[in-house]
Regions:
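Outer-membrane beta-barrel pore domains and translocons
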Residues: 1, 9, 15, 29-35, ...
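Gram-negative/organellar outer-membrane beta-barrel architecture
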Residues: 1-65, 222
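Residues that define the transmembrane beta-barrel architecture of outer-membrane proteins
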Residues: 4-8, 46-52, 89-93, 147-153, ...
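Residue-level detector of the transmembrane beta-barrel scaffold of outer-membrane proteins
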Residues: 9-11, 23-29, 55, 66-72, ...
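C-terminal outer-membrane beta-barrel translocator/porin domains of Gram-negative envelope proteins
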Residues: 36-169, 182-184
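Short beta-alpha connecting loops at secondary-structure transitions
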Residues: 136-140, 196, 216-221
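Outer-membrane beta-barrel transmembrane domain signature
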Residues: 160-162, 171-198
Length: 222
């Protein structure tokens, strides 16, 4: 099966309030997704989704670190040629929490969690996907899970070996992540699942270059 996709989006952000330690902003957006699926030369599906989005974003200094929160609401709209099926008119809520804290001058702890919730049965493109690069490590090519309701938690410790504006920044790190999903109206064993994984790596960055080398291992899964 072959899939062809195209999309465009418009986003606007407005700072509502800020001081030396904190900032609060509001974001609104509109995106249109067009997906076509083919088996050989036969059109299998042709779907257009138009999605409205509103988010509230905040950051503040908290216990010697930086704490961030994003609340997001998405709604499928009957606009710009979108499909008029109930599945295309979904509602989805998301919450992202992150925390960055230097434990010493060189040792840094980072926490991130993303959770989403919908009472609707979502298209696969709108479900929260867990596993792979930028998510739970060790599931890059297989074992990814996705759901209408999901949560992902990541913890990372890194240590700054080099921190120089001239030659760059070099930091080894270790991380552990866990994710779980549940799909609506699917009582089978495939309607829910979880994965966990860990990675150890080396991260290097300078003005025009970023390199991240890591070994990732899947630890457990349903």
């Amino acid at each position: 099966m072959e899939t062809m996709s195209s999309s465009f989006s418009i986003n606007l952000d407005k700072i509502l309030w800020r001081n030396q330690k904190s900032k609060l902003s509001l974001g609104v957006g509109l995106k249109r997704k067009h997906n076509k699926s083919y088996i050989e030369d036969t059109l299998l599906s042709d779907r257009i989704l138009t999605i409205g989005d509103i988010s509230l974003n905040g950051t503040t200094v908290f216990y010697g670190g930086i704490f961030g929160i994003t609340l997001d609401y998405e709604r499928g709209l009957r606009a710009l040629g979108a499909s008029n099926t109930p599945k295309a008119e979904f509602k989805k809520y998301s919450l992202n929490l992150n925390y960055y804290k230097p434990l010493t001058k060189k040792l840094v702890y980072r926490f991130n969690t993303l959770t989403s919730h919908s009472k609707d049965v979502l298209y696969a493109s709108e479900k929260q996907s867990i596993g792979g690069v930028g998510s739970v490590p060790g599931y890059h090519r297989r074992g990814n899970i996705m759901g209408d309701r999901a949560i992902e938690i990541e913890n990372e410790l890194s240590y700054k070996i080099i921190d120089s504006e001239k030659i760059g920044r070099l930091s080894p790190y270790i991380s552990y992540s866990y994710g779980a999903v549940r799909n609506n109206k699917n009582p089978s064993i495939y309607g829910k699942g979880y994965v966990s994984g860990a990675s150890i790596g080396l991260r290097y960055s300078m003005k025009y270059l970023d390199i991240d080398l890591a070994y990732a291992k899947a630890l457990s899964h349903s």
